[in-house]
Amino acid sequence: MAEKLPPEVQAQLAKFQQLKDQLDRLLLEKSTIENELREINKVLEELSVLNADATIYKIVGNLLVKSDKTSVEKELNDRKELLELRSRTYQKQESILRKQLEDLQAKINDMLSKYYPQGGQTGIKA
């Protein structure tokens, strides 16, 4: 395929690449959130075995600050709830982006088959 692609195919390929980049960024953010959720769950699990009057320290910036178990658990549960909401939102966005990519891939392959009917091997894969 040494010849230049038609402008409409180039435009669709550019759109495809933008969607792919958007999906990659979304997956990276989703992974970061999932890692933080795992960490919060581990901390909450450890806190659950401590006595209510146990001495707890949390990191605030560059400082270790003494805190009570109840407030730390509340803070962690609030953060966990927020992250779970974000995770569900990202899952929905991921599903939408994957569908858009799939549809656009089919459209591009269809366009390419019209321009290069005997090519057989032309087309893109996600």
From Swiss-Prot:
Protein's UniProt keywords contain Nuclease: no
Major place of localization? cytoplasm
Its localization reads: Cytoplasm
Q: Which UniProt keywords apply?
A: Chaperone, Cytoplasm
Is Chaperone there in the keyword field? yes
Cited InterPro entries:
PFD_beta-like, PfdB, Prefoldin
Q: Which GO terms describe its molecular function?
A: protein-folding chaperone binding; unfolded protein binding
- GO annotation terms (biological process): chaperone-mediated protein complex assembly; protein folding
**Superkingdom of origin organism:** Archaea
What cellular component terms from Gene Ontology apply here?
cytoplasm; prefoldin complex
Known partners and oligomeric status: Heterohexamer of two alpha and four beta subunits.
Record's family? Answer: Belongs to the prefoldin subunit beta family.
This chain's function reads: Molecular chaperone capable of stabilizing a range of proteins. Seems to fulfill an ATP-independent, HSP70-like function in archaeal de novo protein folding.
User: What is the designated name of this protein?
Assistant: Prefoldin subunit beta
Gene this chain is encoded by: pfdB
